[in-house]
């Protein structure tokens, strides 16, 4: 209090003696202790009270206040707070003087010490409220009386000047943005006051001298992060004429996750849409183009049928869900019979004549018309659009047909749509108890490529699990019934055989994790878990043999070695028992052959007898032999290999005619046996994408050349890259991909390559992201700094890292249902749990589709999907976790620790630029979703970066988005960094107060 009294006395003396500013500065420093701010003794408050003691302001005392501010005796925060506390708004002259004072200092507002930083955001919020009070009071006076005085008009003009200056000062806007998270009550009052001003202006038709001020008031009242400047580094989608990201990403996802529900693909595409800033029209165009592009480059094999089924059965529902999720509440509902954005996308697609010509030639039809005729049933387009687009392609299609002259072999695409009806028929038949009907239907499925087509349709429609479960039930129901003789027994054996072979083929194609439940107790599920050899899932032959019953093995040995003698004895063995005990038979035969107890002719006879009984028996025998081959030396492989080859020996026409539908079942068993043998011991002459004697690097470069030449990611290339990932590991593949990225010479090529690399990393996004952040980026920058880790390479590399982090962060997770947990292509960490997300919108989309819509055709699948979608009403199918999961958290912490070392010096280097680009892109691309990542930023990283990066690239918008402003620690960190930025800017541009 002693110093306060001295200050007041000094003010009286100064005013009475009319001191100059310099005299005031000299004398006030004698009163204040050395090194102590005048804020401690309320110097600004004392001067303000004396300046505004009358009906008009005292200009001399206000000059003393300004001098104290320039001399850093008081802080801007304290002065602003004092002004905002002045509540005698009826004193027009005092208010006008304060407004003029504000206009003179507002461009230089900053903070010098920590204590000031804690006060400034709140002071700015109160100042804005004070300005709005003045504004509201004036316009309300005009509304009541129809006029205002010249003094009031001048005061309003000065208010507009201050508001204009405030709106143009990014630092003050950032302080306001931070302060609004602290002063929630005052922020609410500001918005109420703005509503009052807007109402008064509307009612009174008052014309402002500064027309832009109303928009500025709205900006101040509803301050958001988007109002704060930020240097954009992620290029806008308008610069990309054609995307190189959608097709590779879909190629990888359809390869890895063909069984995933529609919402999985929708979430993936939503993530990509946010990163690339695509409109719905652009996204729909890229999705359809990706489908055509991939189909144009695959042969009539499984990928062809899978992609064709994806286009016809999955893609319409993806587009439908994306459209529903993008709708804004309260927006005018779209037309019921078509999606406007899809029509616009088709108009873009119709211009791609080369692609459509190729597809028309490949499919021997007008592909656009063929596709859209189906989409009309799902109300994606209407008949008018079909006629319009079909007519635009008609002339070209007819010309292509004439040039073709009927020489083109029809593509599987023409038959995919027809496979839907047989699938429904098969599922319906499998629900019955009529054994003969089931045999008749199932034996027709393996004919030609029908089985492949039906599997493709079942996969993308989400009915694969239903198909498998009913096949398993059918296999269970085929057990021999006591008393069955003659034809009925043969029918049951045929039913067991064909269902077993079909199930085994499905497991080989998709993996047991995908199609079987973890604890299924059926015979087939037990046999797969304990006896079947799968790729990358070895079985111990000793454990398989431990399941055998010695008495049954002896009985089977007699039966297969001397079938004539065994026929005289009653045989009560079931087919299931035979399958489980065949390994014991094969083991005895193998040992006896090696010890020369049995001759080659005897072994051949036994193996032929096994195959003649049921073709599934030869599959069970081959599975054991493959497991056995894993456990022996290379010199001991010849005999088991010869035994497998004997199972592949053709049957005579008499043997085939002795069994009904034997030809189809035999062909399917050959296919299964060859695949088992190939996985264990591929033939040396076979050129396989899995087995090669050339170095991995050469294989990778060869695959990458095909990608570059094609301009997209062919399915075969995606399969080869998956094999290289399994062989070389995530770190190796990530390194090779980044090397290809940095080898590009031009920015356009670099961006395209980055898109493909980003998509390829989704072969295992979590492991490749971990490798990228922990083992690739830092060594690369340290080792090659100044060579090719510079602009624009560093920016593209930073963008790749950020894209991968965001994709990894948004990987779907949650409790998940057991059904969906099983729908995995292979063990990828983010597939272990499924996210319970979006509800009402997607449920509505699903509800008004046709009965063939993906993921909901079967009642059990529909229930599972409904449970998956949950009850939240959000437009996103992925939510951001509050904390990061491993290994992402450790990887991010590692790269941030490396960044801290990169900026620890005091020189600007490419390393520091990369750190800035990384952090800026993380904020720009991720928004609020990367909050868990930003929480891991080390203390001091941003401030050190500000000191090193002497350019003007860092803006307040970036700094304000780095911290969680809902908590005090986040606000303090943000203000500290903002004030450092402000002081450095002022020093750099030589701003004098």
Swiss-Prot record:
InterPro entries: Mediator_Med24. GO terms for biological process: autophagic cell death; positive regulation of programmed cell death; positive regulation of transcription initiation by RNA polymerase II; pupal development; regulation of programmed cell death; regulation of transcription by RNA polymerase II; response to ecdysone; salivary gland histolysis. It is found in: Nucleus. GO terms for cellular component: mediator complex; nucleus. Keywords: Activator, Nucleus, Phosphoprotein, Repeat, Transcription, Transcription regulation. GO terms for molecular function: transcription coregulator activity. The keyword Ubl conjugation does not apply. The keyword Nucleus applies. It comes from the Eukaryota. The modification Phosphoserine is found at residues 827, 829. Transmembrane segments: none annotated. Component of the Mediator complex, a coactivator involved in the regulated transcription of nearly all RNA polymerase II-dependent genes. Mediator functions as a bridge to convey information from gene-specific regulatory proteins to the basal RNA polymerase II transcription machinery. Mediator is recruited to promoters by direct interactions with regulatory proteins and serves as a scaffold for the assembly of a functional preinitiation complex with RNA polymerase II and the general transcription factors. Required for activated transcription of the MtnA, MtnB and MtnD genes. Component of the Mediator complex, which includes at least CDK8, MED4, MED6, MED11, MED14, MED17, MED18, MED20, MED21, MED22, MED27, MED28, MED30 and MED31. Belongs to the Mediator complex subunit 24 family. This is Mediator of RNA polymerase II transcription subunit 24. It comes from Drosophila melanogaster (Fruit fly). The lineage of its organism: Eukaryota, Metazoa, Ecdysozoa, Arthropoda, Hexapoda.
């Amino acid at each position: 209090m002693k110093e306060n009294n001295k200050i007041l006395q000094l003010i009286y003396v100064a005013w009475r003696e009319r001191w100059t500013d310099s005299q005031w500065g000299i004398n006030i420093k004698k009163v204040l202790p050395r090194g102590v701010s005048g804020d401690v003794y309320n110097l600004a408050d004392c001067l303000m009270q004396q300046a505004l003691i009358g009906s008009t302001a005292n200009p001399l005392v206000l000059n003393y206040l300004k001098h104290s501010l320039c001399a850093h005796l008081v802080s801007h925060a304290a002065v602003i707070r004092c002004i905002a506390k002045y509540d005698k708004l009826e004193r027009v002259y005092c208010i006008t003087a304060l407004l003029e004072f504000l206009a003179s200092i507002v461009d230089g507002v900053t903070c010098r010490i920590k204590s000031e930083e804690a006060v400034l955001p709140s002071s700015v919020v109160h100042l804005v409220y004070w300005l709005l009070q003045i504004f509201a009071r004036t316009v309300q006076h005009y509304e009541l009386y129809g006029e205002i005085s010249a003094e009031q008009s001048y005061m309003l003009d000065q208010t507009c000047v201050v508001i204009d200056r405030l709106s143009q000062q990014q630092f003050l806007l950032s302080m306001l943005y931070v302060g609004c998270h602290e002063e929630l009550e005052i922020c609410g009052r500001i918005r109420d006051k703005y509503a009052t001003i807007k109402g008064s202006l509307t009612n009174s038709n008052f014309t402002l001298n500064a027309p832009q001020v109303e928009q500025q008031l709205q900006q101040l009242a509803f301050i958001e992060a988007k109002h704060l400047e930020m240097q954009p580094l992620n290029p806008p989608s308008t610069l990309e004429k054609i995307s190189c990201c959608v097709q590779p990403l879909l190629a990888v996802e359809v390869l890895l996750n063909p069984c995933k529900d529609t919402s999985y693909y929708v979430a993936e595409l939503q993530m990509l849409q946010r990163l690339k800033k695509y409109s719905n029209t652009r996204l729909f165009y890229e999705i359809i183009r990706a489908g055509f592009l991939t189909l144009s480059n695959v042969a009539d094999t499984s990928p062809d049928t899978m992609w064709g089924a994806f286009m016809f059965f999955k893609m319409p529902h993806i587009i439908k869900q994306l459209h529903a999720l993008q709708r804004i509440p309260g927006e005018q509902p779209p037309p019921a019979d078509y999606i406007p954005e899809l029509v616009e996308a088709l108009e873009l697609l119709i211009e791609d004549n080369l692609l459509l010509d190729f597809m028309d030639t490949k499919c021997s039809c007008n592909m656009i018309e063929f596709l859209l005729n189906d989409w009309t049933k799902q109300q994606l387009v209407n008949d008018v659009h079909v006629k319009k687009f079909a007519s635009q392609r008609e002339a070209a299609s007819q010309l292509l047909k004439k040039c073709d002259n009927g020489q083109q072999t029809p593509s599987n695409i023409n038959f995919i749509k027809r496979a839907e009806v047989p699938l429904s028929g098969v599922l319906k038949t499998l629900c019955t108890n009529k054994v003969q009907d089931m045999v008749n239907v199932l034996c027709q499925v393996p004919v030609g490529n029908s089985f492949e087509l039906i599997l493709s349709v079942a996969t993308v429609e989400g009915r694969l699990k239903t198909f498998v479960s009913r096949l398993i039930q059918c296999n269970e129901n085929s057990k021999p019934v006591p008393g069955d003789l003659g034809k009925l027994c043969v029918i049951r054996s045929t039913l067991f055989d064909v269902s077993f072979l079909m199930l085994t083929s499905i497991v080989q194609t998709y993996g047991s994790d995908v199609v079987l439940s973890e604890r299924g107790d059926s015979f087939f599920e037990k046999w797969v878990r304990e006896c079947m050899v799968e790729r990358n899932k070895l079985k111990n032959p000793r454990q398989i043999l431990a399941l055998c019953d010695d008495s049954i093995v002896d009985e089977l040995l007699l039966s297969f070695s001397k079938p004539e003698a065994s026929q005289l004895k009653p045989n009560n063995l079931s087919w299931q028992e035979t399958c489980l005990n065949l390994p014991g038979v094969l083991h005895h035969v193998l040992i006896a052959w090696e010890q020369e107890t049995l001759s080659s002719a005897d072994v051949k006879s036994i193996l032929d007898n096994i195959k003649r009984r049921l073709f599934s028996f030869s599959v069970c025998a081959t599975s054991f032999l493959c497991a056995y081959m894993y456990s022996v030396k290379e010199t001991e492989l010849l005999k088991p290999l010869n035994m497998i080859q004997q199972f592949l020996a053709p049957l005579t026409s008499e043997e085939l005619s002795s069994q009904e539908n034997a030809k189809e079942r035999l062909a399917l068993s050959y296919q299964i046996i060859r695949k088992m043998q190939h996985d264990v011991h591929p033939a040396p002459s076979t050129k396989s994408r899995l087995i090669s004697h050339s170095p991995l690097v050469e294989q990778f470069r060869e695959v990458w050349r095909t990608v570059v030449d094609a301009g997209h990611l062919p399915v075969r290339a995606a399969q080869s890259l998956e094999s290289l990932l399994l062989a070389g590991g995530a770190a190796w593949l990530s390194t090779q991909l980044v090397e290809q990225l940095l080898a590009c010479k031009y920015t356009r090529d670099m961006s395209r390559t980055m898109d493909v690399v980003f998509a390829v990393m989704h072969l295992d996004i979590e492991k490749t992201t971990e490798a990228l952040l922990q083992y690739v980026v830092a060594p690369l920058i340290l080792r090659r700094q100044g060579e090719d880790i510079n602009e624009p390479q560093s920016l593209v590399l930073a963008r790749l890292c950020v894209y991968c982090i965001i994709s990894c962060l948004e990987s779907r997770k949650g409790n998940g249902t057991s059904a969906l947990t099983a729908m995995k292509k292979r063990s990828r960490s983010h597939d272990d749990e499924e996210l319970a997300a979006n509800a009402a919108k997607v449920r509505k989309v699903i509800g008004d589709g046709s009965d063939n819509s993906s993921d909901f055709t079967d009642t059990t699948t529909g229930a599972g999907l409904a449970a998956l979608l949950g009850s939240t009403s959000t437009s996103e199918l992925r939510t951001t976790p509050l904390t990061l999961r491993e290994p992402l958290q450790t990887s991010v912490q590692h790269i941030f620790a490396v960044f801290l070392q990169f900026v620890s010096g005091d020189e600007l280097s490419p390393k520091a630029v990369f750190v800035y680009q990384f952090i800026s892109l993380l904020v720009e691309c991720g928004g609020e979703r990367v909050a868990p990542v930003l929480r891991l930023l080390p203390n001091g990283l941003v401030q050190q970066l500000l000191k090193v990066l002497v350019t003007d690239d860092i803006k307040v918008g970036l700094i304000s988005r780095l911290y969680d402003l809902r908590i005090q620690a986040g606000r303090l960190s943000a203000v500290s960094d903002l004030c450092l930025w402000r002081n450095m800017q002022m020093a750099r541009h030589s701003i004098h107060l």
